[in-house]
Amino acid sequence: MAEVNANMVKELREKTGAGMMDCKKALAEAGGDFAKAEEVLRKKGLAAAAKKSSRAATEGQVASYIHMGGKIGVLVEVNCETDFVARTDGFQALVKDIAMQIAAAAPQWVRRDEVPADVVAKELEIAKAQMRDQKKPEAILEKIAQGKLEKFYEQFCLLDQPFVKEDKKKMSEVLTDAVAKIGENIQVRRFARFVLGEGLEKKQENLAEEVAKAAGLQK
């Protein structure tokens, strides 16, 4: 078994953001093997993730992501507990993944409890109305409507969306894995997504006018 020294503990802490004692114990349990030590931290972290979720997370990062071509931009705030973790490569990579997810999947809310009650009611009513002509019992309609509402959440709520890099995993699971690995509470607080020209009425011109303007024949 390899002897665990201070440099090893420091290196694992810098890589994972986990606490010093947690890193030391993980390295000892893994016999000095870094890959195994990371796995130990991850497994222990998963069990503690729920407890960490209630801890104050007031540090973190506000990050931006501009999609290729400059037509989509994202600002996102992701919080953690300490400035040390906020500066680690692992946390910053997570924030970048979250920003890219927002750019690609266009969520409207972070989590489902942020969806206004009137929006939820409207979605349920639309789902029921679509099925009423099939003359199904109201209880069945309610069940079908709830299923459609789940699909709505998966489309428009960030934490319910499939991760664009690994679609078998939800974004909430990506966050849970990060909490397990890093050892701190991590929360997506808010985001803004911008699309070039969104909401603007574009001026329509015919091809003849465009050609004339380009040739200097029309002012």
Curated annotation (Swiss-Prot):
Residues 82-85 are annotated as: Involved in Mg(2+) ion dislocation from EF-Tu. GO terms for cellular component: cytoplasm. PROSITE patterns: EF_TS_1, EF_TS_2. It is found in: Cytoplasm. Keywords: Cytoplasm, Elongation factor, Protein biosynthesis. SUPFAM superfamilies: Elongation factor Ts (EF-Ts), dimerisation domain, UBA-like. InterPro entries: EF-Ts_dimer_sf, Transl_elong_EFTs/EF1B, Transl_elong_EFTs/EF1B_dimer, Transl_elong_Ts_CS, UBA-like_sf. It comes from the Bacteria. It holds the Pfam family EF_TS. GO terms for molecular function: translation elongation factor activity. Associates with the EF-Tu.GDP complex and induces the exchange of GDP to GTP. It remains bound to the aminoacyl-tRNA.EF-Tu.GTP complex up to the GTP hydrolysis stage on the ribosome. Belongs to the EF-Ts family. This is Elongation factor Ts. It comes from Anaeromyxobacter sp. (strain Fw109-5). The gene is tsf.
